[in-house]
Amino acid sequence: MKLTRRYRFSAAHRLDSPRLTAEENRTLYGKCNNPYGHGHDYVLDVTVDGSPDESGQIVAREPLDELVRERVLQRFDHRNLNADIAELAGVVPTTENLTVVIGKALADGWTMPARLDRVRVSETERNIFEMEL
């Protein structure tokens, strides 16, 4: 059985690769290459997989929420992904890369009996990135 919890955070970024020319960056990243950056209201879905325990739950909600607060929301909410997130230093902070960083952050802190199954980060209604763990 799987449980998915949904969280929200806002962050800014600029997609710009030092390996590309200014023209190549504009062509590849479009409006996401705005020199002043831009922001998104991200939606994070965290899915766990397991069997209900004697309490009837796959995982207690509060410890899961606390882990996500500590490992993701407090670190990423209202931040500039280019400047404020060490794991994204030196890489283009695409939502693909952001999803990997979030997945690793949650996996590294995971101590619950249920298995951390996947993370899914929605950047927009049309851009949704999912990573199985």
Question: Where is each model-derived feature located?
Answer:
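Charge-rich, low-complexity N-terminal segments
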Residues: 1-133
